[in-house]
From Swiss-Prot:
This is DNA-directed RNA polymerase subunit beta'. GO terms for molecular function: DNA binding; DNA-directed RNA polymerase activity; magnesium ion binding; zinc ion binding. Its cofactor is Mg(2+); Zn(2+). One of its GO terms (biological process) is DNA-templated transcription. Keywords: DNA-directed RNA polymerase, Magnesium, Metal-binding, Nucleotidyltransferase, Transcription, Transferase, Zinc. It catalyses: RNA(n) + a ribonucleoside 5'-triphosphate = RNA(n+1) + diphosphate. It comes from Gluconobacter oxydans (strain 621H) (Gluconobacter suboxydans). It holds the Pfam family RNA_pol_Rpb1_5. One of its GO terms (cellular component) is DNA-directed RNA polymerase complex. The gene is rpoC. Belongs to the RNA polymerase beta' chain family. Binds 1 Mg(2+) ion per subunit. Binds 2 Zn(2+) ions per subunit.
């Protein structure tokens, strides 16, 4: 073969490359690519169907139509290859050169490239330092541009303009003629069109060599002479545009001018560095892409289908030829100008149709697809053909359940297998001599001869196939199985992998793919086999868990039913006689089985069993255990291991318990045992689910007896609230909230009563089936049972508000017409949401993958000392995520010290496995410092120590693992389960009652932090501190729970008091913010002027009035009203507070006064209250939109304002619509001002002391502020907790490290504060890695390094600003990214995954990372052999 190649020469060479550069092309470059100029708009001859000469499909330019055959047919066959036919001018070669050869069109007049004109910010306009709206009229021949004003003064030209200063040298035609007539000899130079712009661009000294200068300097270099055009020399730099702008920047005073200069300077520097000349943005020549990429295809019926590009090119050629003729004919200026404008528009449409003006449409009124449209969007080149391709050797079919399969198998229909493995079968048939030729083999297969089936069996043996179910939301959506041949036409799937595929058997389809090469088969077997994917990559818990009927079977098997007589565990003996016999004893499982067959023993009876177990030394011992026959059957299939005791299954097995059992088996006995155990467990579950025959009827849904009383009690409460409202004690908003609360509580109580009743086990009656299904985790949830047998409860309007009239009936009792009407509302909204949700969730996943795709494990250890401090997550006193859960599988960044003995329990850099986590938990350590990807110091990618354990394998992570993509999938995959809103189970509201008290969640001893209380007139303690917390400790003083107590709450416990579970410790009104006095005294109103700042509001319903503070519209000039209350003592002096300030209380708008002017008050009394109702009826953004909001780092509406430093609060002078709050530091005397809109409630009072990060105005916090004030660790804490809250609400577990990976990607950029001696500009955002490298270089040279602060970017913005322009272009805003990259001459080093997929190489992760490393070692060895580098340097390069 090689000899043949040598003789024939190679057609298209393939070249290896390491990076791709994108740059503007000069006209010379375009000519060098081209194989000839296209002069005619014709495509093919209508009679002969041969391409026209010099036309768009010309064979002379682009190459022959048939392999090795010229157009006229004079030369045919291989022997003439390379000859150019003298008659038709076609080179005799392969026809595929028509995919590679380009042509060009020489333009009669230059045109601007629309990308650089209209892609904002306009590059051409910025380089000329003109606004875009001045450049456009010049380009499209509406106005003239004065290029050189000659000897005229500016004001002389100004008089000819339209009187505006701005459009610097733009004149319309008439004024231009007048000006030239008036000053004929002044040397004024005016121009119009792209030529003028091109001349303007060339007139600057950019400090970039042009083509001739380049050639001369190259020639000089070859001769060893100094470069005559050395642009780096300071001499040249003297007056280049760049230097002048740097000078201007130093002198710039206003921020706006600085910003404008910086913008232009950056662009100029980009051009200078890339070596592209700005005048190349104006083209003299248009390249024409190869004809096979814009084909003309004959349809049947003699018509042709063509690519839109041909139409667009034809317009350009037509207009260009017409323009040439007009110029030759010396046509009047106005005609030529019009033709030039039309040419400009034609070229615009070719490059980007519709970017300017109306899009050019084809015959069917549809806009033509231009070159830009070919790249853009889901159907563009990037996403349609480069990132996602269709593959051969695949098939798809419906799936059915295959319960008799082993975990690593799948059933493949014979017909399908025969088709998929055809080539393999052909080769085997030939090998065994059944067929002599491939053709004969083909015929045998078509006839389906018996020997074909035998060979198919052999071919398929141990050849894995991959099954995929769309949508593939995470990597477990494609897994490999060994096929077993089955009859029928459906694929059989193992039931245990359904969770991973999210498959069910209601008509789902799956695709089969065959890995062909040996390497592919190897990877499929080692990495993708279903038996290798037992754990979920999202949380490290088993994903191969039984569900539905298997769980039900196991639950039924492990039930323990109470008996008529209460059998004690041991025999009761009185006076030497056995009064009550002990449960019967059995020696082994076989004995039990025979007893059950004979009917003397039931599945759920109590028995004693002598069971062989393995003790700590690994010896086998027998011990007697109290259990049931069912549990003994389960124990029989448990692997024998000392860490797996019988007690693991000697309990009621719910889905969660089964999962824990599988987890334990996997951790202790390894993968193989776990897989075998899972298969056996599945068989057992199915068998007993069938034997149990569990079913339920209407009477199994038991309506609790307590329901009527509970509903009655709540109705009374609601009437009471109504009465309070009528009496004017509460506002309408408060009444609504209280009613909703009461009904929520009632619904919960009914549900609890129903669950209690339904789960009762009565002797002699079987366990309730509905309860079994729900409790075991097989099907149904308490929320659904509540609607069946409890009460449906509150419903939701589509707007998210809760309808205060609940549905008291349940489905068993039946709904009335009104009930049905109320509930149809929310139920429909739920369905509509589901449809929207899927698309949104998919888009979130796509953005996450894009931002994290180049996060790969690159080295074992980066050696950093930094880390994050982690503690258990508490939510209203409950531990939501324990410390051990959060640190499992992470590496320690500091030693863990025992809190009591102060010994080092574990040294730093220990990977925390289950045993270590237990050790830390037992020692009572409160917080642990762990390494995190956020603090990893690796330059590219992440190191293995900072990442920790690979969750899907349970081992330390391997180098080359694509952790970014795994993180993105883990966060995106549950996205579809997250609601769009936080409620809906068939429209039912699940907003719990608003928290209005703190109950102890366990027994313990009370410690109160930040206790600041006063006793009010009712002798109740009222909390005055804004960050008071109640801690519950156990007898060893270890904190077990922590509760936040708000300002104004009534405290019911004292320091050191012992409390019991569910004891009330504090309560408060959840719907108002009180303002409470700390001292006794007489109230005095200040600036509370009737009908200006204070109004009496009448309630229409109750006829009662209340005094409300209003936001006054600016009173008379110079009057600064600040409504407030102050306290005076008996002698009329202002009362002083404990901190020495006067007792003054500022009132924000909407406060309702609770005291009259001159009233006597005691400490702890409420002076005024601010209703909170507005914030609570609005639905809190929940679910998916909340996750997206956090990842996009958006500023929430009505966000909190946080203090940037500590200090005391003072109120400054108010402005028209803002209040001024000053935080003054006592030590430094530094003051920070915050302007707060008047309508917002300021949550601090004058004289309060605030810490850094405390809120001055309540509301959701802004991530950017947290980063700026508190730093990276606080930000990561906030984001991780907020995102986890959303997922926890849905019961989805995701490991923190996945969120950290994404946050790391969001923090890739820094903003320059001081440039030092670097070339950076103030306010510029640069890549963190680049910035650190630059600073290192500066410090090595003894220069001042730059200073910068980290910037938080949303995931979309971060993806668009990655180092790789290929990856960014394939994500979004393709044209903008490519325009940007071209101006700065960007180089893509192909580090991420997407870029490599696009250019068609192995991705640098997984197996590909090894190949990459080997390639770089080989390359550096080559360099060493050539250049003689030291072996040490080569090793460094390989590292």
């Amino acid at each position: 073969m090689n000899e043949l190649m040598k003789i024939l020469g190679q057609t298209g060479q393939s070249v290896t490359f390491d990076q791709i550069k994108i740059q503007l092309a000069s006209s010379e470059q375009v000519r060098s690519w081209s194989y000839g100029e296209i002069k005619k708009p014709e495509t093919i001859n209508y009679r002969t169907f041969k391409p026209e000469r010099d036309g768009l499909f010309c064979a002379r330019i682009f190459g022959p139509i048939k392999d090795y055959e010229c157009l006229c047919g004079k030369y045919k066959r291989m022997k003439f290859r390379g000859i150019v036919c003298e008659k038709c001018g076609v080179e005799v070669t392969l026809a595929k050169v028509r995919r590679e050869r380009m042509g060009h069109i020489e333009l009669a007049s230059p045109v601007a490239h629309i990308w650089f004109l209209k892609s904002l910010p306009s590059r051409i306009a910025t380089m000329l330092d003109l606004p875009l709206k001045d450049v456009e009229p010049v380009l499209y021949f509406e106005k003239f541009l004065v290029l050189d004003k000659g000897v005229c003064e500016s004001d002389q030209i100004d008089s000819y303009k339209n009187g505006k200063k701005r459009d610097q040298y733009l004149l319309d035609e008439i004024r231009c003629e007048d000006l030239l007539d008036e000053y004929p000899d002044a040397g004024i130079d005016v121009g119009i069109g792209a030529e003028a712009i091109k001349r303007a661009l060339s007139s600057y000294d950019w400090g970039i060599p042009n083509d001739q200068e380049r050639e001369l300097s190259l020639a000089a270099k070859e001769k060893g002479l100094p470069d005559p055009f050395d642009y780096d020399a300071d001499v040249m730099e003297g007056d280049s545009e760049k230097t002048m702008m740097r000078k201007k920047l130093r002198k710039a005073t206003s921020e706006a001018a600085r910003k404008k200069l910086v913008k232009r300077l950056k662009l100029v520097e980009a051009f200078v560095e890339s070596g592209s000349r700005p005048d190349w943005m104006i083209m003299d020549i248009v390249p024409v892409i190869p004809p096979e990429l814009r084909p003309l295809v004959p349809l049947d019926g003699g018509r042709f289908a063509t690519s839109d590009l041909n139409d667009l090119y034809r317009r350009v050629i037509n207009r260009n030829n017409r323009l040439k003729r007009l110029i030759e004919l010396r046509a009047p200026d106005i005609i030529v100008r019009n033709e030039k404008r039309m040419l400009q528009e034609a070229v615009d449409a070719l490059f980007d149709n519709g970017r300017r003006g109306r899009a050019i449409t084809g015959a069917n009124k549809r806009p033509l697809k231009s070159l830009s449209d070919m790249l853009k969007g889901k159907q563009g080149r990037f996403r349609q053909n480069l990132l996602g391709k269709r593959v051969d050797y695949s098939g798809r079919s419906v799936i059915v359940v295959g319960p008799e399969l082993k975990l690593h198998q799948c059933g493949l229909p014979k017909k399908m297998a025969l088709e998929l493995f055809k080539p393999f079968i052909y080769s085997k048939l030939e090998k065994y001599g059944h067929a002599t030729t491939i053709k004969a083999a083909k015929r045998m297969v078509e006839k389906e001869r018996p020997e074909v089936w035998d060979i198919l069996e052999e071919v398929i043996r141990e050849h894995p196939v991959m099954l995929n179910r769309a949508p593939t939301l995470h990597r477990l959506g494609i897994q490999a199985f060994e096929p077993t041949l089955i009859e029928g036409k459906a694929i059989q799937l193992h039931p245990l992998v359904c969770t991973a595929f999210n498959a069910d058997f209601d008509g789902d389809q799956m695709a089969v793919h065959v890995p062909l090469s040996l390497e592919a088969q190897l990877e499929a077997r080692v990495l993708m086999m279903s038996t290798n994917n037992i754990l979920s990559p999202a949380n490290g818990k088993p994903i191969i868990v039984p569900s539905q009927d298997i769980v039900l079977g196991l639950y039924y098997l492990s039930l323990e039913v109470p008996e008529y007589r209460e059998t004690p565990d041991e025999a009761v003996i009185k006076d030497g006689k056995i009064v009550t016999a002990a449960p019967p004893a059995y020696s082994d499982v076989a004995e039990i089985e025979s007893a059950m067959l004979s009917g003397s023993l039931k599945l759920h009876d109590k028995i004693r069993l002598r069971l062989p177990t393995i003790d700590a030394e690994g010896k086998s011992v027998r011990q007697t255990i109290l259990t049931t026959p069912g549990r003994a059957l389960i124990a029989q299939i448990l692997p024998k291991h000392q860490a797996i005791p019988f007690s693991l299954v000697n309990k009621q097995l719910t889905k969660k318990n089964v999962s824990d059992v599988i987890d334990t088996v996997y951790r202790h006995c390894g993968q193989k045992e776990a897989v075998i155990f899972c298969d056996r467990l599945m068989g057992l579950g199915f068998r007993h689910a069938a034997r149990a025959g569990i079913s339920f009827g209407k009477d199994d849904m038991i309506i609790p007896e307590a329901k009527a009383t509970l509903v009655g009690k709540t109705s009374e409460e609601v009437k009471e609230f109504e009465q309070q409202y009528q009496d004017g004690l509460i506002t309408a908003g408060e009444r609504y909230n209280k009613v909703v609360d009461a009904w929520s509580r009632c619904t919960d109580e009914v549900q609890a009563a129903m669950l209690k009743e339904i789960s009762k086990q009565v002797i002699g009656k079987p366990t309730n089936s509905v309860w079994m299904m729900s409790h075991s985790g097989a099907r149904g949830s308490p929320a659904q049972m509540k609607q069946l047998a409890g009460m449906r409860g509150l419903m939701v309007k589509p707007s998210g508000e809760i309808i205060e009239q609940p549905i008291i009936a349940n489905f068993k009792e039946g709904l009335s017409v009104l009930d049905y009407f109320t509930s149809s509302h929310g139920a429909r909204k739920g369905l509509a949401d589901t449809a929207l949700k899927t698309a949104n969730s998919g888009y979130l996943t796509r953005r996450l993958v894009d931002v994290a795709q180049d996060c790969i494990i690159v080295e074992p250890d980066c050696g950093t000392e930094r880390g994050l401090t982690v503690r258990a997550v508490m939510d209203s006193g409950e531990v939501v995520a324990s410390l051990s859960e959060r640190i499992l599988g992470r590496t320690l960044s500091k030693d863990v010290i025992h809190p009591v003995t102060q010994d080092v329990i574990l040294p730093r850099n220990t990977l925390i496995e289950e045993a270590e986590a237990e050790l830390i938990e037992k020692a009572g350590v409160e917080s642990v410092d762990i390494r995190s990807v956020l603090t990893c110091d690796s330059r590219v990618g992440i190191c293995a120590h900072c990442y920790g354990r690979d969750l899907a394998r349970g081992t330390p992570v391997n180098i080359g693992e694509a952790v970014g993509v795994i993180a993105a999938q883990s966060i995106g995959e549950p996205g579809t389960q997250l609601t769009m809103r936080t409620f809906h189970i068939g429209g039912a509201a699940t907003r719990g009652a608003e928290q209005s008290m703190v109950e102890a969640s366990r027994d313990g001893i009370v410690t109160i932090k930040n206790r600041n209380v006063v006793e009010n007139s009712q002798k109740v303690l009222v909390v005055m501190s804004r960050n008071c917390e109640i801690l519950l400790t156990d007898e060893n003083g270890v904190e077990r729970a922590r509760y936040r107590v708000p300002y104004g709450a009534r405290l019911m416990v004292s320091e050191g008091e012992a409390v019991t579970r569910t004891q009330k410790m504090a309560e408060w009104d959840p719907y108002t913010l009180p303002i409470i006095t700390e001292q006794a005294g007489t109230v005095e109103y200040l600036d509370l002027i009737d009908s200006i700042t204070l109004v009496e509001r009448m309630d229409e319903v109750t006829g009662l009035s209340s005094k409300v503070v209003v936001d006054y519209k600016q009173a008379a000039k110079g009057v600064d009203l600040r409504p407030r209350l102050q306290l005076k003592d008996a002698s009329g002096n202002v009362v002083k507070l404990a901190n020495g300030n006067d007792a003054r209380y500022f009132l924000s708008p909407d406060s309702i006064l609770s005291v009259e002017n001159g009233a006597e008050v005691n400490a702890g009394d409420v002076l005024a209250r601010i209703p909170r109702e507005g914030s609570k009826t609005r639905d809190i953004t929940g679910g998916l939109p909340r996750v997206a909001e956090l990842f996009e780092a958006r500023r929430p509406k009505d966000h909190a304002i946080i203090a940037e430093g500590e200090g005391r609060i003072e109120f400054g002078k108010d402005y028209k619509s803002k209040r001024c709050v000053i935080v003054k530091n006592d030590d430094t005397g530094e003051e920070t001002q915050y302007l707060i809109p008047k309508g917002k409630h300021v949550s601090v009072q004058e004289g309060d002391f605030v810490q850094k990060g405390d809120p001055l105005v309540d509301g959701p916090r802004v991530p950017h502020d947290i980063l700026k004030v508190m730093g990276v660790e606080a930000l990561s804490d906030y984001l991780v907790n907020e995102i986890q809250d959303v997922y926890r609400l849905q019961g989805v577990k995701i490991n923190d490290k996945h969120i950290e990976v994404i946050v790391r990607q969001m923090l890739q950029k820094v903003e320059i504060l001081e440039p030092g001696d670097s070339t950076y500009l103030i306010g510029e955002t640069v890549d963190r890695i680049e910035y650190e490298g630059e600073n290192q270089r500066l410090m090595e040279n003894g220069d001042t390094p730059a200073k910068a602060m980290p910037v938080l970017q949303g995931i979309t913005k971060a993806s668009l600003q990655t180092q790789s322009f290929i990856s960014a272009a394939s994500f979004q805003e393709t044209t903008r990214v490519l325009t940007d990259a071209a101006t700065s001459g960007k180089v893509d080093t192909l580090n991420g995954l997407k870029e490599n997929v696009i250019v068609g190489r192995l991705i640098p992760a997984g197996t590909g990372s090894v190949m990459n490393r080997l390639r770089s070692i080989a390359a550096s060895q080559d360099r060493q052999r050539v250049g003689g580098a030291s072996p040490k340097a080569v090793e460094d390069a390989a590292e």
